[in-house]
C-alpha cells in the first residue's frame, strides 16, 4: 500500500511508533522489523524525558545492530529517522578508525563531529529568529556607505526603499566587512593527549579570540553582494553564542544519533589474514566500548556525555558474523534487526511508491526540458527483473542497482532531451529490452557496466 503524507493529532510526546513507521513508509519500502525497532527506540527517548527523579538518568537507549546486505535500506532508515526528529545525525564508517596510539582517526572524533553538527543546527535556527533584525541592521550599514551617517532621515528612507525594491542591487559601494582571512596558520592536533581529547585546535581561532574578533577591512562590492555578506555578520552579533553552545551540547547528549556503518569490517575472524590487522580491528572495537556504554568526551565546546546518545551500527556480515564482534560490544548493541534482501516486488515498489522515487526523479529531470517521460507498467516490471538478475549473478547491491540500470536505460534520452522539446516519450518493456538485453546477457560486461 502506498504511503501518503498524513497530518497527525498533536501528541505531547511527539510521534507515536506507528506514526514514525508510517512516515518512514513514505520513503522506504519494506523492512518493517527495522522500522519498528527504530520507532520504539525513538519513542523511548520521549518517554525517558518524562520520567522524573534519578531514574531518568538510569534509563539508557537500547542501541541497535542492523544486519543486511548493502542497498536494502539500513542507512536510509537512520537518515530519515534523524530528519524526522530534527536530531543531530552523524554517519561514519567503522573502517575509518584506528585504535588510540596509531596514526589515523580515533573514535572520540565521532562525538566531536556530532557536537559540531548540533552547534551548526542551533546556530542556523537562532539566525532565522533574528533574520529580520539582522537584515535591518545590514540595510543601515549599506545606507551609511551610500548616503553617509549624517544624511537626513528622509534621504535614508528614500534610499532604503530603493534597496528593498532591488533598484540599487548592481550599484558598487565601498563598505567595511569582517576580515575572514585565517590568522596564524591552520589546524592541528595536540600530540600525546589521550585520544586528542580536545579535538582539532585552530590557531586562527585562538589568536582571533586573544586579539578580539573586530578586525575589519574595506572592500568594494555590489549592494546585493554586500547584503549577502553583512546579514550573516549582523546575525552573528545578535545571537548568544554561549547559549547556542549549551543548547547544542544538550541536543547532542539527549537527541544525538550516531550511525556506524560497516561494523562487520572490524570484526575479527579466524581467516582474517594478518595477526596485526586483527589486533588493530579489535582495538577499534575496544575504543568504541566506552563511547557506546557512556563516557565523557572533551570537545572544544566543552565536555559531552555519551550516555544517552543513540548508536545504530550496521553491517552486511557476509564473511564475519555478529558473534565475531567482541562480546562486550555485542552486549552494548542489544537490539538486533535483520534486514531482508530485496525481491522483485520490492524493486517495483521502490521504483514507484516512495514520495521521491527514482521514476519521479528522472521524470522531473527530463521534464525540465519540456519533455514528458512516462513509464509503462511492463517497463517497470522489466527493470525490476533485470535488477534482480544482475544482483543474483554479479553482486547483490540491493536498490542501488536500480540507479545504474536507469542511468544506462535513459542515457540517450538524457543526452538528446534538450532537442526534443514538447515531445512525449513512453518507456515500455520493448524499449528496456532493446537498451539493456545485450548487457544483461553478457555477464562479463554487466560486471563493468551495471
Curated annotation (Swiss-Prot):
SMART domains in the record: AAA (SM00382), ClpB_D2-small (SM01086)
Keyword Cytoplasm: yes
Signal peptide limits: none
Annotated binding of ATP, by residue: 29, 71-76, 261, 328, 400
InterPro entries: AAA+_ATPase, ATP-dep_Clp_protease_ClpX, ATPase_AAA_core, Clp_ATPase_C, HslU, MCM_dom, P-loop_NTPase
Cellular localisation: Cytoplasm
GO CC annotation terms, alphabetical: HslUV protease complex
Disulfide topology: none
Alphabetically ordered keywords of this record: ATP-binding, Chaperone, Cytoplasm, Nucleotide-binding, Stress response
A biological-process GO annotation: protein unfolding
Gene Ontology molecular function, alphabetical: ATP binding; ATP hydrolysis activity; DNA binding; peptidase activity; proteasome-activating activity
Matching SUPFAM superfamilies: P-loop containing nucleoside triphosphate hydrolases
Family label: Belongs to the ClpX chaperone family. HslU subfamily.
Alphabetized HAMAP family for the sequence: HslU
Subunit structure: A double ring-shaped homohexamer of HslV is capped on each side by a ring-shaped HslU homohexamer. The assembly of the HslU/HslV complex is dependent on binding of ATP.
Annotated NCBIfam families: hslU, PRK05201.1
Function field: ATPase subunit of a proteasome-like degradation complex; this subunit has chaperone activity. The binding of ATP and its subsequent hydrolysis by HslU are essential for unfolding of protein substrates subsequently hydrolyzed by HslV. HslU recognizes the N-terminal part of its protein substrates and unfolds these before they are guided to HslV for hydrolysis.
PANTHER family: ATP-DEPENDENT CLP PROTEASE ATP-BINDING SUBUNIT CLPX-LIKE, MITOCHONDRIAL-RELATED (PTHR48102), ATP-DEPENDENT PROTEASE ATPASE SUBUNIT HSLU (PTHR48102:SF3)
Full protein name: ATP-dependent protease ATPase subunit HslU
